[in-house]
Amino acid sequence: MAHVLARRMLLAAASLSAAFVSSGLAAQTYRDRLPQDEVVYFMLPDRFENGDTANDRGGLKGDRLTTGFDPTHKGFYHGGDLKGLTARLDYIKALGATAIWLGPIFKNKPVQGAPGQETAGYHGYWITDFTQVDPHLGTEADMRGFVDAAHARGMKVYMDIITNHTADVIAYKECPNSSCVYRSRADYPYQRQGLNPGFLGDQVQTAENFAKLTNPNFAYSVTVPKAEANVKAPAWLNDPIWYHNRGNTIFRGESSQMGDFVGLDDLMTENPRVVAGFIDIYGGWIDKYGVDGFRIDTARHVNPEFWAAFGPAMLARAKSKGIPNFHIFGEVATSDIDVALLAKHTRVDKLPTVLDFAFARAVYDTVAGAAGTDTFTRLFDNDVLYEGGVATAQQLPTFLGNHDAGRFAHFVRMQNPKASDDEVLKRVILGHAMLFTLRGVPVIYAGDEQGFAGDGNDQDAREDMFPSKVASYNDNKLVGTKATTADSNFDQAHPLYRAMAKLAALRLANPALTRGRQIIRNYEEKPGLFAVSRIDPATGREVVIAFNTSTAVITRNVEVDPKSRGFRALHGVCAPQVTVAGSYAVTIAPLDYVICAAGAAE
């Protein structure tokens, strides 16, 4: 495998300059695309492809508790890296992806956790050094090579960033060997026992006020291990004064923004010094690599004032570097169809967009589950709640599953334990048809196109694309294939890969599916028809998309624009003419969909 990848890397390097010239149209114009024009492919680099075995241990020596490397354990580094990702760019491009969302690539604390419960920072969310690439994933040159190779192919690069916390370095003397309960501002004020005289609290967010916050021991007695006293970068991050230091969050009330996320050092993002510091950190990555967007981890756990400063600063920084359509989307995790919660973070926090967790839940309920298709009205009718309304909703990244919640195929099997392999495949394809054709920006989670299902959430949903050595991955039954995760899973003939590639091509070829206004046409209070029209913004012509979430054939009349008379099939069987002006008949097989494009008005 290593020599094959090396050859692929050499060929990619040799053709890079030619790509700028010969396939240059996409490469020259990718900056002009709006966020809703993209198809996004998301992966954790450690689990994608191993292009350089020399960096598997991150330059460290010792066992897995020192290096973090153990390819047989689902909670440690497995060897994937930036060189491997670069070598597989053509695979991603052939799928139809136009942007790559790269899991965090910053230097992480290799291993953390209580004795016997240690795991590694393979996922990228335990950062110690915000200024360099994790040595397990490669070098700055590897990052530059990846970004340049993606851009040469007309593909954008989105970085996954964190401002809420760092790795777990700070400890509290009161609870050295256990979880430290959250201590509130009311019970443990900043000026407790005469500390920090004159400090007016974190709600007065001025440099003058925070200059009076000099002692971090207001809630707990803070300590930092000597071996880690200078482990963080930039160096200012090593001072505990820049952190909340109040113990673990309980994910509600003030602890949601001020508590340590499962022990991780929670940054005091109310402090202007922290705000300025992170604007400088992430602005530097834009300057250095010309990346095209940021996914913001744990965005809901950071105070709104931080985002009100950070977001505009990043957009301005990107624009100054010739990146006019920089895409920022925050993680506001929810397991409900709670559009109000998501929208609040675009209005109060001023985040440009957020990941559409409500969309994922709606598809889960209707396609994996058996909820009525009226579920989608709860989702789309509330698009007006977002700052900017439906225009913002068009730019929300939509998804079906991810590395935290789990994979969509897993949800399908959990909700349909007696379903045949064919039914599971049909439900997974139907869910992705919704993902690619309904409003929003579709995000594919790496491995979904190869039928990965996983055993659940988090570590159980982070399988390797390259041959895995994890037993609990390799015993999984994949969807649409006889392969297992013990194999290399980059099969472009896989039925899910082919289905997604076709959907991506349809989406990218039809502006109605990227920039078009969406009109809900039909829905039911049971499994069955859900239909929408997407309107081409240039021609005004509609594309009718109709889904059947039931296990029976359905024939229904769908309301259409009275000017729409003739139709052509983009997918499935479409009647060539309307029944009568304003009414179009569709027949849809079980767990299937049709896409019918109206011609010129008669």
List each language-model region with its residue ranges.
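Substrate-binding/active-site clefts of carbohydrate-active enzymes
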Residues: 32-39, 46-284, 288-289, 310-319, ...
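Carbohydrate-interacting/catalytic domains
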Residues: 5-42, 57-61, 78, 83-86, ...
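Conserved, mostly hydrophobic/aromatic
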Residues: 43, 92, 102, 130, ...
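Short, flexible loop/turn elements at secondary-structure junctions
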Residues: 44-47, 106, 134-137, 163-165, ...
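Structural preference for beta-strand elements that scaffold enzyme active sites
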Residues: 40-42, 99, 156-158, 293-295, ...
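Short, solvent-exposed loop/turn elements at domain surfaces
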Residues: 48-57, 406-409, 474-476
